[in-house]
């Protein structure tokens, strides 16, 4: 459960991300595909090479979903319900991949905002990403 302080921390770090979200999304996917190559299996139709247009486009979607969750931080499940349905019923993505993606996003944020990612903010962002992961995997049951 996200505390009031967690919500403030998450909103604050996303404010710092600002207009860099699309780049961070692509960087997150690139990192995930490099560190966890098994995740590429869900993207057989993608050019998963560094900097590809498809990676950039999907990275933009990933960050847009995270921003949607931040904007509805008190109802993440409602905000991401359709996305949860898509991943559970149509795409059938292994639920473990959401946690891998979240960890890669944390690394990217840390690279670009090291001074802002204090231990408290890091913990809050991790809790938020875990909450998003939980929502996205809830409909697998």
Curated annotation (Swiss-Prot):
Domain of life, per lineage: Eukaryota
GO BP terms: hydrogen peroxide catabolic process
UniProt tissue specificity: Red blood cells.
Cellular compartments per GO CC: blood microparticle; haptoglobin-hemoglobin complex; hemoglobin complex
Disulfide bonds: none
Binding-site residues for O2, renumbered to this chain: 58
Keywords: Heme, Iron, Metal-binding, Oxygen transport, Transport
One Gene Ontology molecular-function label: organic acid binding
InterPro entries, per the entry: Globin, Globin-like_sf, Globin/Proto, Hemoglobin_a-typ, Hemoglobin_oxygen_transport, Hemoglobin_pi
Binding site for heme b: 87
Database matches in CDD domains: Hb-alpha-like
Function: Involved in oxygen transport from the lung to the various peripheral tissues.
Family statement drawn from the similarity comment of this UniProt entry: Belongs to the globin family.
The protein's assembly and partners: Heterotetramer of two alpha chains and two beta chains.
Protein name, as recorded: Hemoglobin subunit alpha-A
Species the sequence originates in: Eudynamys scolopaceus (Western koel)
Gene: HBAA
């Amino acid at each position: 459960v996200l505390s009031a302080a967690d919500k403030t921390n998450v909103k604050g770090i996303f404010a710092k991300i600002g207009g860099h979200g699309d780049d961070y999304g692509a960087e997150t996917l690139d990192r995930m595909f490099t560190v966890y190559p098994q995740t590429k299996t869900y993207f057989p139709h993608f050019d998963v090479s560094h900097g590809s247009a498809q990676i950039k486009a999907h990275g933009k979607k990933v960050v847009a979903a995270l921003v949607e969750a931040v904007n509805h931080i008190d109802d993440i499940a409602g905000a991401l319900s359709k996305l949860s349905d898509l991943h559970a019923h149509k795409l059938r993505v292994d639920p473990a991949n959401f946690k891998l993606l979240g960890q890669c996003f944390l690394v990217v944020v840390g690279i670009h905002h090291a001074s802002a990612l204090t231990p408290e903010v890091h913990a809050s962002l991790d809790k938020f990403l875990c909450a998003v992961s939980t929502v996205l995997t809830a409909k697998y049951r």
